[in-house]
UniProtKB/Swiss-Prot annotation:
It comes from Homo sapiens. GO terms for molecular function: ATP binding; dynein heavy chain binding; identical protein binding. This is Cytoplasmic dynein 1 light intermediate chain 2. The gene is DYNC1LI2. The keyword Transport applies. InterPro entries: Dynein1_light_intermed_chain, Dynein_light_int_chain, P-loop_NTPase.
Length: 492
């Protein structure tokens, strides 16, 4: 047996220390290379797992449907500015697991069809696979819902056809969309974080991998991209029930037609309300789930009539038929516009508000109107002269003949103690009439023949004045004669 030192020398050889040093360097280089490889692998993995950019959301809807307000609310802004033509904003998307951020482009088309040509600036043939479409329907006006959805769906179909996408690429998009629709699986109850879509199956029989065939009227209008139907202003359901006498039958009829439309396009359906902030968070989560593949664990919601949520791939004709069980006055196949009728336009008649005019202003206007009235030649003679009793007397009835004379044979009335008061009031009346006549006489006459007319006026006015004065004198003398006659009769 060789000594230990000899064994070491034999193992190391004549240049033993140098060979050992070279071996140590080789191991260090291998460790360094493995470290760099792990770093590069981690970087490449992060690059692959980074949130993709360039995702688009295309929003359609009528003017006043609340589409801009809805997307602004999802953006987190309090107030949005209404634009024209084609509006743009973005949604901030944050992945907490990867600590990554990105922006999702949002394009909102104007409700006027005149601006549909602007779609070419929002979505192209290259960006179509990265696009999610949202059709907005106004539930405060349910009679416009189906017509609006059909209109905007045809606009989108027309725009896709104009892109002239190669048939092979378009068929690939359609096949992928059908697969996503068929692969829908309801999330397990109480399982948080489980994906809504079924991932690669690691176990199970081959029967689980077989996709079920599409039913009737399902994906008959395949656009190749995910579609979402959002009903806004669902808080107006209570208003429809009060003002338009809507019942559960009306709401179920509307929902059944909406779900049939969604089946044709493979779309999801969600009822929202910005006013009550209902289903807004659910809408945002579903959008990022369909766009970026985030986990989504909310099942379908069909209990609340104003907070419905139907994910794409969950619905079918049998589930929709459950709504038909409550129909009593309508049939499922009836036309939408025959049962959901547009109410007649009520013209609001507002009573005109009359502002009370100031009293002094009113009197000044009346004074100016009276001053502008021209005086006519017969105006003075036609003015009524009122007697002590207040009854009007015309010129023809005036004069001494109008006063009945007392005859000796007639019975004389007893003197009235109020005669003196009547005489005083008669004086006031006389001064009033004289002031009126003096005003009338002050109006200027026309030149030329005005001399004759003014003379006639003055003579007529003097006659009236004399008649009035004589009448007043006679009335004042009447009490004295009555007293004298009564005293004479008593003496006799």
């Amino acid at each position: 047996m060789a000594p230990v030192g000899v064994e070491k020398k034999l193992l190391l050889g004549p240049n033993g220390p140098a060979v050992a040093a070279a071996g140590d360097l080789t191991s260090e280089e291998e460790e360094g290379q493995s470290l760099w490889s792990s770093i590069l692998s981690e970087v490449s993995t992060r690059a692959r797992s980074k949130l993709p950019s360039g995702k688009n959301i295309l929003v359609f809807g009528e003017d006043g449907s609340g589409k801009t307000t809805l997307m602004t609310k999802l953006q987190g802004a309090e107030h949005g500015k209404k634009g024209r033509g084609l509006e743009y904003l973005y949604l901030s998307v944050h992945d907490e697991d990867r600590d990554d951020h990105t922006r999702c482009n949002v394009w909102i088309l104007d409700g006027d069809l005149y601006h549909k040509g602007l779609l070419k600036f929002a979505v192209s043939a290259e960006s179509l696979p990265e696009t999610l479409v949202i059709f907005v329907a106004d539930m405060s006006r349910p009679w416009t819902v189906m017509e609006s959805l059909q209109k905007w769906a045809s606009v989108l179909r027309e725009h896709i056809d104009k892109m002239k996408i190669p048939p092979e690429k378009m068929r690939e998009l359609e096949r992928k969309f059908v697969k996503d629709f068929q692969d829908y699986m309801e999330p397990e109850e109480g399982c948080q974080g489980s994906p809504q879509r079924r991932g690669p199956l690691t176990s199970g029989s081959d029967e689980e991998n077989v996709a079920l065939p599409l039913g009737d009227n399902v994906l008959t209008h395949n656009l190749g991209i995910p579609v979402l139907v959002v009903c806004t202003k669902c808080d107006a359901v209570s208003v429809l029930e009060k003002e338009h006498d809507y019942r559960d039958e009306h709401l179920d009829f509307i929902q059944s037609h909406l779900r049939r439309f969604c089946l044709q396009y493979g779309a999801a359906l969600i009822y929202t309300s910005v006013k009550e902030e209902k289903n807004l968070d659910l809408l945002y989560k579903y959008i990022v789930h369909k766009t970026y593949g985030f986990h989504f664990t909310t099942p379908a919601l069909v209990v609340e009539k104003d907070a419905v949520f139907i994910p794409a791939g969950w619905d079918n004709e049998k589930k929709i038929a459950i709504l038909h069980e409550n129909f009593t006055t309508v049939k499922p196949e009836d036309a939408y516009e025959d049962f959901i009728v547009k109410p007649p336009v009520r013209k609001l008649v507002h009573d005109k508000e009359l502002a009370a005019e100031d009293e002094q202003v009113f009197l000044m206007k009346q004074q100016s109107l009276l001053a502008k009235q021209p005086a006519t030649p017969t105006r003075a003679s036609e003015s009524p002269a009122r007697g002590p009793s207040g009854s009007p007397r015309t010129q023809g009835r005036g004069g001494p003949a109008s006063v009945p004379s007392s005859s000796p044979g007639t019975s004389v009335k007893k003197p009235d103690p109020n005669i003196k008061n009547n005489a005083a009031s008669e004086g006031v009346l006389a001064s009033f009439f004289n002031s009126l006549l003096s005003k009338k006489t002050g109006s200027p006459g026309s030149p030329g023949a005005g001399g004759v007319q003014s003379t006639a006026k003055k003579s007529g006015q003097k006659t009236v004045l004399s008649n009035v004065q004589e009448e007043l004198d006679r009335m004042t003398r009447k009490p004295d004669s009555m007293v004298t006659n009564s005293s004479t009769e008593n003496e006799a």
